[in-house]
Amino acid sequence: MQKEAVRDAANLPSIRSLVRAVGFEGRSLHSINDLTNDQIYALFELARALEPFHRSSVDLLRGSVMVTLFFQPSTRTRMSFETAMHRLGGAVVTEANPLVSSSAAKEESLADTMRTISKYANVIVLRHPDDVAAREGASYSESPVINGGWGDWEHPTQALLDLYTLWRTHGGVEGAKVVVATPDMVHARTGHSMAYGLARLGAEVTLASRSDYRAPEEVIEGLRRVEGAKVREVFDLDQDGFNDLVSEMDLVYLPGCSAPKGEAAEEFKKMMDEYYVRLETLEKVRESEGRIIRVTHTLPRRPGEMDLRIDDTPHQQYFEAIAYSVAIRMALVAAIVGA
């Protein structure tokens, strides 16, 4: 502990300088597009400096309080945010089931909830199933609000994590060939945020989905406005076509897909079969070209989305990304709260 304290004291001035360099103090993060490219890269540099502390602590935010307010289930997002705040020396108040245990159970409006919580918190992380309600509710907060996943719209901090992981493992984002693949791009909020981030940072982006579940027009229009963006859409691939597409990539990005129930379940299974990532496809490229195609998934994953044998190979990046999740969220929280 004494050695860690000495290390903290030695690193604090340089880390605080990196925090200030982001230039995001007091700001909310609703969309990945709330950050400039320079701010994204500044967050990456800050996260890299904070990586040594992801299992210890650095005393940047002592006395600050984060409230995590999650109207939908979460494991990784909520826990990594809460861990990040603890590692920064701050405190966390969590409400993981507000419809049961908070005043939301008494039909309190989200606006009033946010008004109230913002009196306590230096920063709020909000997850909500309705993005319109979340955006409106967040506007009533006096404290910065971080989107922890809002409806089908965006999940910017998951995209930040996956962009950071690509930056760390691939040596950069610019020029990387990435496919965002899911039969249902309509409801892929992480895919929307990731597509924006990839396009803005210079990756070559392919959106692969069913034509009747393509990305919302708002997302497509947003991508068209990105100067110099290299983005294409492909639809209705069969398994052979999908395998060929995967073979061209540096990264296969799986934003997940919500499985329907009842009669639609069988049709869903057929859809998933067409976007199933097979180890044989990856290994064929590795053997013929000496190139490793990485696969990442936002998790949780469901049976039938991918070949589980990938877990124990160099192609796997989804569990590797979790190791970076605390550092990038430490960086974001520190930049917003200020240190």
From Swiss-Prot:
Which top class of enzyme applies to this chain? transferase
One GO biological process from the UniProt record?
Answer: purine nucleobase metabolic process
Q: Describe the temperature dependence.
A: Thermophile. Is much more active at 60 degrees Celsius than at 30 degrees Celsius.
Q: What is its EC number?
A: 2.1.3.16
Enzymatic reactions: (S)-2-ureidoglycine + carbamoyl phosphate = allantoate + phosphate + H(+)
Any one cellular component term from GO for this entry? Answer: cytosol
Pathway info: Purine metabolism
From the UniProt record, which GO molecular function terms apply?
amino acid binding; aspartate carbamoyltransferase activity
Against Gene3D superfamilies, the record matches this protein to: Aspartate/ornithine carbamoyltransferase
Keyword tags: Purine metabolism, Transferase
Q: Name one Pfam family in it.
A: OTCace
Complex formation: Homodimer.
Q: Tell me which family the UniProt entry assigns to this protein.
A: Belongs to the aspartate/ornithine carbamoyltransferase superfamily.
What is this protein's function? Catalyzes the phosphorolysis of allantoate to ureidoglycine and carbamoyl phosphate. Is likely involved in a purine degradation pathway.
Q: What is this protein called?
A: Ureidoglycine carbamoyltransferase
What organism, scientifically named, is this protein from? Rubrobacter xylanophilus (strain DSM 9941 / JCM 11954 / NBRC 16129 / PRD-1)
